[in-house]
Design a protein with these regions (language model features):
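Polytopic alpha-helical membrane proteins, predominantly small-molecule transporters/carriers
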Residues: 1-299
Length: 299
């Protein structure tokens, strides 16, 4: 199937997963326990979905080790991202971590000798501007600190390295072991989050003690159904992204996925959740669309 079609399907799956997650966070309790429970349910569903499609996939020692490393880095990224959001301003945290897409984007040229044209460089610059303009600054109680910056940088590096590992695996003779790679990574993620939930349930630490302004409990039928659907979306998104990272140029794939995903998220927030964008955010979205066009190097 055409890579453009696969990319569109991947981004659609990612968007649907994001919409479902937004629905959950708006109506049901949040907090670290709810997040870890969500991650455990989604990761387990994704692993089972991939297993159901592929059966018992073959896995070389290289794939097993890289998948475990991928799962560990993803876990560290999740923890440091949450800590950064807790310790400092949301706006700056969002921009800094979003810019991590530059790491896998430039890795194609630095590690795999991929060529980046002047038009694509312009697209990357516009993508950076899109990330910055799409976030509203000011009016936040939390201030920047050394602790916040340390967590931000850790999340930035981990997020970027996740993309590099995808590209790395798909650039080896073991690229056909996609299902094994993802199943192992999702299993690692499930075990980590499930272990946290178990410890939290036993010790009563990390559990939400209030109703969060009347929000419903996450342990209910509707949230579980949403998590199951989200897990299927995550499985499809990650499987397609892993494949595309090996067959598309890094300077095209990673900025398009991240920048295009941001534009789609902004559009969904307007159409579905009736959110209003500032003039600056509209400019950011327009730059994001132009940057994706330039990254595809149509000239």
């Amino acid at each position: 199937m055409n890579n453009t079609v696969l990319l569109a399907v991947s981004m659609a799956a990612c968007l649907l997963g994001g919409i479902l997650r937004k629905f959950l966070t708006d109506r049901y309790e949040n907090g670290i326990f709810a997040y870890q429970f969500y991650n455990a349910a989604v990761s387990l569903t994704a692993a089972v979905a991939l297993f159901a499609v592929s059966g018992v996939p073959e896995a070389s020692p290289f794939t097993v080790m890289l998948a475990l490393l991928f799962g560990l880095v993803t876990l560290i990224q999740q923890v440091t991202n949450m800590q950064a959001l807790e310790a400092g301003p949301l706006s700056y945290t969002t921009v800094i971590i979003s810019l991590s897409t530059l790491i896998p984007t430039l890795s194609g040229a630095v590690i795999w000798d991929e060529k980046i044209s002047a038009v694509q460089v312009a697209g990357i610059i516009l993508m950076v501007a899109c990330f910055v303009l799409s976030v509203e600054f000011g009016g936040e109680k939390k201030k920047a600190s050394f602790r916040w910056l340390a967590f931000c940088l850790a999340a930035f590096l981990c997020t970027g390295f996740i993309g590099v590992m995808q590209k790395w695996h798909q650039s080896t003779p073991y690229s056909g072991e996609q299902d094994a790679f993802l199943i192992i990574a999702f299993a690692f993620s499930f075990i980590s989050s499930a272990a946290y939930c178990a410890v939290a349930a036993i010790t009563k630490k990390g559990l939400n003690k209030d109703k969060e302004n009347g929000k419903k409990k996450i342990l209910a039928l509707v949230p579980l159904i949403i998590m199951l659907v989200s897990g299927v979306c995550v499985a499809a998104n990650n499987k397609l992204n892993l494949h595309l990272s090996g067959v598309m140029e890094s300077a095209v794939f990673f900025p398009t996925v991240n920048g295009g995903g941001l534009v789609l998220t902004l559009l969904a927030s307007i159409a579905i959740f009736k959110e209003k964008l500032s003039a600056k955010q509209w400019v950011g979205m327009a730059l994001g669309i132009v940057s994706v066009i330039l990254l595809c190097n149509p000239f």
